[in-house]
Amino acid sequence: MKVAVLGAAGGIGQALALLLKTQLPAGSKLSLYDIAPVIPGVAVDLSHIPTAVEVKGFAGEDPTAALEGADVVLISAGVARKPGMDRSDLFNINAGIVRNLVEKCAATCPKALIGIITNPVNTTVAIAAEVLKKAGVYDKNRLFGVTTLDVIRSETFVAEAKDLNVADVKVPVIGGHSGVTILPLLSQVEGVSFTDAEIAALTTRIQNAGTEVVEAKAGGGSATLSMGQAACRFGLSLVRGLQGEANVVECAYVDGGSEHTEFFAQPVVLGKNGIEQVLAYGEVSAFEANARDAMLDTLKADIQLGIEFVK
């Protein structure tokens, strides 16, 4: 099993690489790429950790060598948010980066499962899809927007609010991956009930958690460590699915035939071909239905921005 991380020298990329080095199945290969010249050194640094995962680093303009034979590609390359920026401000820089990297994936590892971490995910996933379509290799079951950070934040905040064991908390998160498009389905959390005020407060905190980190870091970056953990969880789930493990379910932003928008975050079953099955997200409360319906114009506009960028 070969996993490639593109943008591996950044804050998310290094955290993700460390976690993958310690958690990938024995015998796996970890391929790290970045435009920054430090990345071969990051690979050497990681190679001293005693796990049976081979690590190689590739620097420079061309990621082809890093991508050869990759089963999973996780893309975290791009610039991070700073105070005063929202995820859409990142579009002007990150759109071109994602386009160029996905073009290389299409040419080098067209069957790989691709997880897009680079923000704004609502838009960058649409860019990736259009690039893959242009190359004639698009498979909607092999492209994912990684929204796992919204899930782990939801699980953490609910466990804290209700004094639960976080390992027992499961919160599906649907929609997209920015602001109002992030919708945790708190009505579906088992064995716990919330007041209307709690639901409103938790939902807002989950939606604004990225900004909470950006402001707390005071200009020193955005959510890198928690995002690295979230991306590792999702990447390992992709690997487990590829290896034939049953019942591997994660929420992800996918082209899953949603009635709402072309791309929509919802639970999916992962398997040997990427998405084996898109799961219905089930019954929602009136609050959640209203929040879902209110986000759709924003989400559609984000998606259209990505489509237009590639055209």
Curated annotation (Swiss-Prot):
User: Which cellular component terms (GO) are annotated to the entry?
Assistant: cytoplasm
MF-aspect GO terms: L-malate dehydrogenase (NAD+) activity
Query: Any idea of its EC number?
Result: 1.1.1.37
Q: Which reaction does this chain catalyze?
A: (S)-malate + NAD(+) = oxaloacetate + NADH + H(+)
**Can you tell me which residues form the catalytic site?**
177
| Residues where NAD(+) binds | 7-13, 34, 94, 117-119, 227
The record's top EC class is oxidoreductase
List ligand-binding residues for substrate: 81, 87, 119, 153
Biological process (GO) annotations held by this record are: malate metabolic process; tricarboxylic acid cycle
Give the Gene3D superfamilies listed for this entry. Answer: Lactate dehydrogenase/glycoside hydrolase, family 4, C-terminal, NAD(P)-binding Rossmann-like Domain
InterPro entries documented for this protein? L-lactate/malate_DH, Lactate/malate_DH_C, Lactate/malate_DH_N, Lactate_DH/Glyco_Ohase_4_C, Malate_DH_AS, Malate_DH_type1, Malate_DH_type1_bac, NAD(P)-bd_dom_sf
Q: Sorted alphabetically, which keywords does the UniProt record give? A: NAD, Oxidoreductase, Tricarboxylic acid cycle
Look up the domain of life of the source: Bacteria
Q: Which family does it belong to?
A: Belongs to the LDH/MDH superfamily. MDH type 1 family.
Q: What does this protein do?
A: Catalyzes the reversible oxidation of malate to oxaloacetate.
> How does the annotation summarize its subunit structure?
Homodimer.
What's the protein here called? Malate dehydrogenase
Give the originating organism.
Shewanella halifaxensis (strain HAW-EB4)
Per the UniProt record, the lineage of the source organism begins with: Bacteria, Pseudomonadati, Pseudomonadota, Gammaproteobacteria, Alteromonadales
* Designated gene of the protein: mdh
